[in-house]
Amino acid sequence: MDPNPKPAISGKDNGVFEHRSFARIGFLGNPSDVYFGRTISFTIGNFWAWAKLEPSDHLLIKPHPFHDLVQFDSLDNLVYRLENDGYYGGVRLLMAICKVFRNYCKENGIQLHDKNFTLSYDTNIPRQTGLSGSSAIVSAALSCLLDFYNVRQSIRIEVRPNLILNAEKELGIVAGLQDRVAQVYGGGLVHMDFSKEHMDKVGYGIYTIMDINLLPPLHLIYAENPSDSGKVHSTVRRRWLDGDEFIISSMAEIAKLAEEGRTALLKKDYSNLKELMNRNFDLRRSMFGDECLGAMNIEMVEVARKIGAAAKFTGSGGAVVVFCPEGPSQVKLLEEECRKSGFIVEPVKLVPTRLSSSDIKTLSKT
């Protein structure tokens, strides 16, 4: 992919639309978004997914030449690909969002023209790293559909994460709204309140954009061999639904970390921020257990903590966000430890909110 990608929207005059959606870091409060909690999340400029929609005579969902590969050198090569990358590429994601988008518009009286299109995608988000790669593809595709059908102002921005999540649910993907909110808001730092009362009333949370510059310098650690981010919630959710007091109280404490984190960020109290990040991971570990989290994922956190940095999962495993409060000297130690352990480490690239004027107009006043 182009390391210097085009603007989010291009080619309006000829009916061609291109959109990017960035990888996401769950900074504090995750995974309480699935449990009526609170989170702080943001997207990063390090990785992104890209979708392109162009008018065509027939409706075509275009397979990716690598991610949707159907031709192999040998049977062994086919099996190797399936064992490492699974059975699924991005075509199913594009088809699912097309279905969910069309049904939502039909159910809500939003008229769509009858022109056809070709929809394609690309992505450089590492697979299974807990950076929300699947929803980034769906988010980028949804943005293309909104523009192609000229219905951006008819579908409020708060509703769009639900459409993305519903598309993923069609495919059996286990997730919450947090990632989709961060990606729909297109950058910036977002505080999210998923309180049950509000969710039951309107179907989405209370989303507040914060200044991305409140964040201290952060780093990303990830491993090239993937983690399974689709099964991590399963056992804990069942216990939560069964009324397990330990799970319920621990999840409430994780949600509280997002509130404390918002205060710490506004005050730039980074020493407290370090403690909150570490506490977030410790609570997750106590609920899910080491076997569920995976030895390599835990090792990434411990590599950072070994040199006195704060660390937690960006999502459900596969990547870790790190804060080095002591600055460049501590970053050098982090880089050396990651090199020894075979992990990739790089600075987090922050991106400001990319909401357009038409998007902002759809924000509810409630």
UniProtKB/Swiss-Prot annotation:
Domain of life: Eukaryota
EC nos: 2.7.1.43
A GO term, aspect molecular function: metal ion binding
Gene3D superfamilies reported for this sequence: 3.30.230.120
Active site: D179
Record site: Transition state stabilizer: R24
Reaction(s) this enzyme catalyzes, per UniProt: D-glucuronate + ATP = 1-phospho-alpha-D-glucuronate + ADP + H(+)
Keywords noted in UniProt: ATP-binding, Carbohydrate metabolism, Cobalt, Kinase, Magnesium, Manganese, Metal-binding, Nucleotide-binding, Transferase
Pfam family, one: GHMP_kinases_C
Record text on cofactor binding: Magnesium. Can also use other divalent cations like manganese or cobalt.
Cofactor dependency: Mg(2+); Mn(2+); Co(2+)
Residues involved in ATP binding: P126, R127, Q128, T129, G130, L131, S132, G133, S134, S135, A136
Protein family per UniProt: Belongs to the GHMP kinase family.
Role noted for this protein: Sugar-1-kinase with a strict substrate specificity for D-glucuronic acid and ATP. Involved in the biosynthesis of UDP-glucuronic acid (UDP-GlcA), providing nucleotide sugars for cell-wall polymers. May be also involved in a salvage pathway for glucuronic acid.
PANTHER family referenced in this protein's UniProt entry, alphabetically: WITH PUTATIVE URIDYL PYROPHOSPHORYLASE-RELATED
Protein name in the entry: Probable glucuronokinase 2
Lineage, broadest ranks: Eukaryota, Viridiplantae, Streptophyta, Embryophyta, Tracheophyta
